[in-house]
């Protein structure tokens, strides 16, 4: 059956700047906002936009991510005319190898894409926090008679040199692409979201480059090729909330923004829900000794200490006398008695022993890795 627009989520990133938090899982699988994982936002955008057939391209440490996505039922992607397909690197008679970049990952999955027979392909990153209607982007793509549409967001001019910058004419047609320019001409930053006409992209990927080494990334290789070939390439301007949470500081800050409800993402919007695979946990327990101020305590938590301006994800235990401030505690963490945690991110299933101090500051967030053990734990003294 033909699919008008097929979604392809690039979810194989290692996320090296997140350090300990991605030592055993891909960046899109990192928890966010108490009950979500980063990839939930892209998957939910697809579901809410009516993009019901999605390929998720994974590579680095995919086990947890694959288990989280499953057959896509949590996002309504398991119906008769819907699907969520995990796509991993494989070897065939041509000697295929690891995905070397964004464009190469799509090239290696041409057979899957052809099986869906799409008119358009929507290529997405699985590691950003945002809400976006891809249907509106497709409508503009068709209206412009575009061969490629690139989603862009305006960033402060002083930060533009950190991004791939799209320079456009008055009609919104992209005339020039600059990868992290020293002296940017505009502030239209690429979001790494693309809509391509599939037949043309397929032709470019299979015949447009001399070797696979010339066809690694969309930003470095494919977009410049389209512009050089005078293809109709347009910018789609997005003005909503969008965060790249690829560093410890940005991940911590985005969680705090969500908690404050200032310019952060509204996760309580019933017209555009963010879905996730959530276990069925008992209600949280907050004892009479506990004190909670401006914090989020998710299902399955036990709190017998003081929580200030922090997020406690599912199944977190905080024993008596402990104090947590300005911190993000990820799922399954066990915190003993009289512990102090400030300006920190504590990774999944970590254990913090009695009396331990985990303290950073706004300019230097302290990180405890997944399953890391700190201090003296019960039965170890």
From Swiss-Prot:
Gene Ontology biological-process entries: glycogen biosynthetic process
InterPro entries given in the database record: ADP-Glc_PPase (IPR011831), ADP_Glu_pyroP_CS (IPR005836), GlgC_bac (IPR023049), GlmU/GlgC-like_hexapep (IPR056818), NTP_transferase_dom (IPR005835), Nucleotide-diphossugar_trans (IPR029044), Trimer_LpxA-like_sf (IPR011004)
The protein's Enzyme Commission number: 2.7.7.27
Pathway(s) it belongs to: Glycan biosynthesis; glycogen biosynthesis
CDD domains attached to this UniProt entry: ADP_Glucose_PP, LbH_G1P_AT_C
Keywords assigned: ATP-binding, Carbohydrate metabolism, Glycogen biosynthesis, Glycogen metabolism, Nucleotide-binding, Nucleotidyltransferase, Transferase
SUPFAM superfamilies in the cross-refs: Nucleotide-diphospho-sugar transferases, Trimeric LpxA-like enzymes
Catalytic activity: alpha-D-glucose 1-phosphate + ATP + H(+) = ADP-alpha-D-glucose + diphosphate
Binding site for alpha-D-glucose 1-phosphate: 164, 179-180, 190
The protein's enzyme class: transferase
ATP-binding among keywords: yes
An annotated Gene Ontology molecular function: ATP binding
TM segment ranges: none
Function summary: Involved in the biosynthesis of ADP-glucose, a building block required for the elongation reactions to produce glycogen. Catalyzes the reaction between ATP and alpha-D-glucose 1-phosphate (G1P) to produce pyrophosphate and ADP-Glc.
Record-stated family: Belongs to the bacterial/plant glucose-1-phosphate adenylyltransferase family.
PANTHER family per UniProt: GLUCOSE-1-PHOSPHATE ADENYLYLTRANSFERASE, GLUCOSE-1-PHOSPHATE ADENYLYLTRANSFERASE-RELATED
Subunit relationships: Homotetramer.
Protein name, as recorded: Glucose-1-phosphate adenylyltransferase
Native source species: Lactobacillus acidophilus (strain ATCC 700396 / NCK56 / N2 / NCFM)
């Amino acid at each position: 059956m033909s699919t008008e627009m097929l979604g392809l989520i690039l979810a194989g990133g290692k996320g090296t700047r997140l350090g300990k938090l991605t030592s055993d899982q891909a960046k899109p699988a990192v928890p966010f906002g108490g009950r979500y994982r980063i990839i939930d936002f892209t998957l939910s955008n697809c579901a809410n936009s009516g993009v019901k057939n999605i390929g998720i391209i994974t590579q680095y440490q995919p086990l947890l991510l694959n288990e989280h996505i499953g057959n896509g039922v949590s996002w309504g992607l398991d119906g008769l005319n819907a699907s969520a397909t995990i796509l991993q690197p494989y070897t065939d008679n041509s000697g295929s190898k690891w995905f070397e970049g964004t464009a190469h990952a799509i090239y290696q999955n041409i057979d899957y894409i052809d099986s869906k027979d799409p008119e358009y392909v929507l290529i997405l990153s699985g590691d950003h926090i945002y809400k976006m209607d891809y249907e509106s982007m497709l409508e503009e793509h068709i209206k412009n008679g575009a061969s490629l549409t690139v989603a862009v967001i305006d960033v402060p001019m002083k930060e533009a040199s950190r991004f791939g910058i799209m320079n456009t004419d008055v009609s919104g047609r992209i005339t020039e692409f600059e990868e992290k320019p020293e002296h940017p001409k505009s502030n239209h930053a690429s979001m790494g979201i693309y809509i391509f006409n599939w037949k043309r992209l397929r032709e470019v990927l299979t015949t447009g480059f001399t070797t696979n080494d010339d066809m690694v990334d969309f930003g470095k290789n494919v977009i410049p090729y389209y512009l050089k070939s005078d293809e109709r390439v347009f910018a789609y301007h997005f003005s909503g909330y969008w965060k790249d949470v690829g560093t410890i500081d940005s991940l911590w800050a985005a969680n705090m923004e969500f908690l404050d409800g200032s310019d952060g993402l509204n996760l309580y919007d019933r017209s555009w829900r963010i879905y996730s695979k959530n276990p069925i946990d008992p209600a949280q327990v907050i004892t009479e000794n506990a004190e909670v101020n401006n914090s989020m305590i998710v299902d399955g938590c036990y709190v017998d200490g003081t929580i200030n301006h922090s997020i406690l994800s599912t199944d977190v235990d905080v024993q008596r006398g402990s104090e947590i401030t300005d911190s993000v505690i990820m799922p399954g963490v066990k915190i003993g008695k009289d512990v102090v945690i400030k300006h920190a991110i504590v990774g999944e299933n970590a254990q913090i022993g009695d009396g331990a101090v985990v303290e950073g500051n706004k300019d230097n967030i302290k990180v405890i890795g997944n399953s890391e053990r700190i201090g003296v734990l019960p039965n170890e003294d």
